[in-house]
């Protein structure tokens, strides 16, 4: 257990010591929030108003629904994409040869793997909590409506999706051995995951075959959890 703790501590230190990697992970949710507010907020609002037709609706209620949609989309995407960025240390150790030095020591391979998982979960969790704080500030500007129980439920969803993103990134990055491969995978995940998990577009808008295929992916249910609790 002490070995696992020391390895996890080492990985966390290396992550936070790399200012470029840390600030890239930290600023990603903020950039996404700005993009969502700029481009998606009006789209969501127009969509809701079109469904309501001539039915009178309080403007603050519409803003609350739009805010819930935006923060759930942001958190659903960030918890996974940031995990891939945080888990780059696994690839960097292979590139620099540090993994060979670690493997010749009397450290179990399982302890080494779990240390990468734990450090990635910690780093991603910190960024996820910061992102959630930014989302709460945005809701405060729009008109805060969430109860303490709702906030705790969303926070629990963030933890759950952080663990999912960490597991997914660990399974993928385990097979990567160069920075080019890691960059390519990160680009694909950042560009496509939001569509796959239903954050950018509702799954119901997809063709029937694609919709059934996406229903087998755990990420879609993580987005649903966040939507249910953010719009409760």
Regions found by a protein language model. Give the residues of each.
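Short, membrane-interfacial amphipathic segments enriched in basic
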Residues: 1-9, 165, 210-216
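Residue-level recognition of transmembrane alpha-helices
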Residues: 7, 25-26, 74, 93, ...
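Hydrophobic alpha-helical transmembrane segments of multi-pass membrane transport/permease proteins
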Residues: 10, 14-48, 67-82, 121, ...
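Residue-level recognition of membrane-helix boundary sites in multi-pass small-molecule transporters
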Residues: 20-21, 111, 181, 212
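Hydrophobic alpha-helical transmembrane segments of multi-pass membrane transport proteins
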Residues: 31, 35, 62-141
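Transmembrane helix segments
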Residues: 34-43, 173-227
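Perimembrane loop-to-helix junctions flanking transmembrane segments
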Residues: 47-62
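Alpha-helical transmembrane segments and their short interhelical loops
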Residues: 109, 117-194
